[in-house]
Amino acid sequence: MITTRLARMGALAPKSRLLFGTRGMATVADLDKKVEMCNLEKGNYINYKKMSENLDVVRRRLTRPLTYAEKILYSHLDDPQNQDIERGKSYLKLRPDRVACQDATAQMAILQFMSAGMPSVATPTTVHCDHLIEAQLGGEKDLARANEINKEVYDFLASSTAKYNIGFWKPGSGIIHQIILENYAFPGGLMIGTDSHTPNAGGLAIAAIGVGGADAVDVMAGLPWELKAPKVIGVRLTGEMSGWTAPKDIILKVAGLLTVKGGTGAIIEYHGPGVNSLSATGMATICNMGAEIGATTSLFPFNDRMYDYLKATKRQQIGDFARSYAKDLREDEGAEYDQLIEINLSELEPHINGPFTPDLATPISQFKEAVKANGWPEELKVGLIGSCTNSSYEDMSRAASIAQDALDHGLKAKSIFTVTPGSEQIRATIERDGQLKTLEEFGGVILANACGPCIGQWDRKDVKKGTPNSIVSSYNRNFTGRNDANPATHAFVTSPDLVVALSIAGTLNFNPLTDTLKDKDGKEFKLKAPTGDGLPSRGYDPGRDTYQAPPTDRSSVDVAVSPSSDRLQLLAGFQPWDGKDATGIPILIKCQGKTTTDHISMAGPWLKYRGHLDNISNNMLIGAVNAENGEANKIKNVFTGEYGAVPATARDYKARGVKWVVIGDWNYGEGSSREHAALEPRHLGGLAIITRSFARIHETNLKKQGMLPLTFSDPADYDRIPPDATVDLLCTELAVDKPMTLRVHPKDGASFDVKLSHTFNESQIEWFKDGSALNTMARKSGN
């Protein structure tokens, strides 16, 4: 059920209690303790006392119950006394506790930080090497190859992190989000990360938000971070899962209800008695995939399952400290949500979502019919489990139990089957406890502890590009061509349990809840429902040491960037606005339909250029469909009349000193946090991106780089814009809460005006005028 009115939690249901009981008011002595955020850093403490004091100020001002999401945000306000607070409207200035960067986005973030001229980061920061390892032959061989071909980038990251007091996780350590959950996330905290799936950490009751590199640089430099106060969507869970239903099915169901843009501008807050039946890592899975519905972040209230996970990962002292602050690590009685969804876990079916979009949700009982009705390729070519979304000990244990059931009947995977451990700790633990051996005997290829096929780092050989085929993964995202660069691949996402089951059958036309298989002797049998412990009974095995702490003396550390490098390039500042309206400028491309960050700045083979802005700009918008001809990467140059690639045409306009705009459709920039999708159009001379609507992170990234993200005040005006028109953009009209004018000059016909809306505030307008947020920072600091 979905309720779209303001929903008062306390009036709708009894408040689900913490299993260990809710304590009364914490004393000052309780909150005065010095408890470090993690075991790997010294001197960085959890400040529940300051959070509590900030909340007291806000409570006196608002005089109403607060959601848990609000508590975290308001407890991290830079100025709780004077901050305007209105959900969905105010811009909050916040002080995050941590920053995390993955290696593909860290390069540009650190290059920007270097240009700010500071000696070290002002906020605890880590960098994680997980995106640049391509899946080819298997874990160790792929890791060795990655270390060789990415040596220049890894050396840059290792030296720059050492120079600027940043923790560094080496290649092979694991995926950023799993490392954060295992080491850094803590209840009640606020962190940002340069990856859209940063909300994964919400499984430990922290508000973890994906941002672009420019936002990360602000926080690394000690500046407040700005976020439009999100609305809060409540998801109330009742009942308890059993059998083949997994935590993944909760978010697959929610994605189907809310769609890829239904969470935009909102935090998803899970609550209710059903929460206590989920493991901490199961909650992390749900929070991770909240990115697919556009949510700012997702989170759960602190409970005993989280305490158990903190204890298992050698952070019991954090769990004990959190218990002293427990009353503010959950929603208040009577807290109101802008929208409420209710899900009975006892009735929830396993789901499979896709293809081509993560919000096309189909219950397993209806999936065969959907396959037939839509003509999706029935044969399952590849099953893939793991990734940041589903690679916990519980996930791997349940998957191995199904694989063992098949092996006991003389069966192995019919489909190609791959396993991606989420971290070195997970890999070492499941190797010790036997799950890895079972999955290998089942036919699994064990990939490196890295992102791999989930982000397109997959040198796939079993089908030719352009050949229709089906793959099923436990990943989070399944946009066209994302995993294997084949636009004809039908990619579906589901739980690891169903991936294993379908891989045994080798077909999409299999429902393990009702269908039978034939064993080696031809006898029919049904797979047993998966089983597996949430935490290892013998504790976690940390495996190899893959962490590099910054040295105590950093004065002698040099960061070298070769001027001849094709992977790394020092940044030059963007030019400030000239103070004039832009007249007679071309529309570079009018994008038709879904235009994700994968369409704007592809990953896969382009990841190696993430530290070199000019080189990676050669992939700008090459995946976007041109509304003029229905083709990708084929647009008309208004000066030559010739058709060419989007980046080449943009470079020609830039060489002529001509600015340009892009016209976009709904939810433009959906997907990842990659700021390259904003840096590239700015670098190649773009002025504005004008759309029906934006995804949150991309809109902010464009503002940070001095671009104008604008929306049609009337979305129907998108259809009125001829792709070959020229336009005037009246930039001098830019003001808070005021519309702007786009004057359209069709090639044939009379000119007409279109009204444009925007979400700029005063400080963001400064970014545009100065040329970028980084320029504004430099101007104000005198650098």
Swiss-Prot record:
Induction note: Down-regulated under iron limitation conditions.
Pfam families the UniProt entry points to: Aconitase (PF00330), Aconitase_C (PF00694)
Cofactor (UniProt): [4Fe-4S] cluster
One Gene Ontology MF term: aconitate hydratase activity
Role: Catalyzes the isomerization of citrate to isocitrate via cis-aconitate, a step in the citric acid cycle. Also catalyzes the reversible dehydration of (R)-homocitrate to cis-homoaconitate, a step in the alpha-aminoadipate pathway for lysine biosynthesis.
GO biological process, one term: tricarboxylic acid cycle
Recorded catalytic activity of this chain's protein: citrate = D-threo-isocitrate; (2R)-homocitrate = cis-homoaconitate + H2O
UniProt gene name: acoA
Residue numbers binding [4Fe-4S] cluster: C388, C451, C454
Region (Disordered): 524-555
Protein name as it appears in the record: Aconitate hydratase, mitochondrial
Sequence positions that bind substrate: Q102, D195, S196, H197, R477, R482, R610, S673, R674
Superkingdom of origin: Eukaryota
Pathway stated in the Swiss-Prot or TrEMBL entry: Carbohydrate metabolism; tricarboxylic acid cycle; isocitrate from oxaloacetate: step 2/2; Amino-acid biosynthesis; L-lysine biosynthesis via AAA pathway; L-alpha-aminoadipate from 2-oxoglutarate: step 2/5
Note: The fermenting yeast S.cerevisiae has 2 aconitases, ACO1 essential for the citric acid cycle, and ACO2 specifically and exclusively contributing to lysine biosynthesis. In contrast, in respiring filamentous fungi the ACO2 homologs (acoB) seem enzymatically inactive and the ACO1 homolog (acoA) is solely responsible for these functions.
Transit peptide region: 1-25
Any one Gene Ontology cellular component term annotated for this protein: mitochondrial nucleoid
